[in-house]
From Swiss-Prot:
Protein name: Small ribosomal subunit protein uS17
PANTHER family given in the database record: 40S RIBOSOMAL PROTEIN S11 FAMILY MEMBER (PTHR10744), SMALL RIBOSOMAL SUBUNIT PROTEIN US17M (PTHR10744:SF1)
InterPro entries per UniProt: NA-bd_OB-fold, Ribosomal_uS17, Ribosomal_uS17_bact/chlr, Ribosomal_uS17_CS
CDD domains associated with the record: Ribosomal_uS17
Lineage: Bacteria, Pseudomonadati, Thermodesulfobacteriota, Syntrophobacteria, Syntrophobacterales
GO molecular function, one term: structural constituent of ribosome
Disulfide bonds: none
Assembly notes: Part of the 30S ribosomal subunit.
UniProt KW Flavoprotein keyword: no
GO biological process, one term: translation
Species the sequence originates in: Syntrophobacter fumaroxidans (strain DSM 10017 / MPOB)
UniProt GO cellular component terms: cytosolic small ribosomal subunit
Protein's job: One of the primary rRNA binding proteins, it binds specifically to the 5'-end of 16S ribosomal RNA.
Keywords assigned: Ribonucleoprotein, Ribosomal protein, RNA-binding, rRNA-binding
PROSITE patterns noted in UniProt: RIBOSOMAL_S17
Length: 87
């Protein structure tokens, strides 16, 4: 079967915190090119994402997907855990 495209934004990031119940903080890093100095600069954003099974641990690489607002700050859902953190 073919998968349906959801049309929602997805991001790949690293779990920074899992101290809240069913919520993780995911940091997404990207490189931007500075127009004047022609250097690549690392920028990052933090997103709170819903983790229904509390499966994510700090350091895991995850895929998050945009969703309806779940709380005041939570608008993303953890779709898949790509890599488990090496402890």
């Amino acid at each position: 079967m073919e998968e349906q495209k959801s049309g929602r934004k997805t991001r790949v990031g690293r779990v920074l915190s899992n101290k809240m119940d069913k919520t993780v903080v995911v940091v997404v890093e990207r490189l931007i090119h500075h127009p004047q100095y022609h250097k690549f600069i690392r920028r990052q954003n933090k997103f709170k994402a819903h983790d229904a099974q509390n499966a994510c641990r700090v350091g895991d690489r995850v895929i998050i997907e945009e969703s309806r607002p779940i709380s005041k700050d939570k608008r993303w859902v953890v779709v898949q855990v790509l890599d488990k953190a090496v402890i």
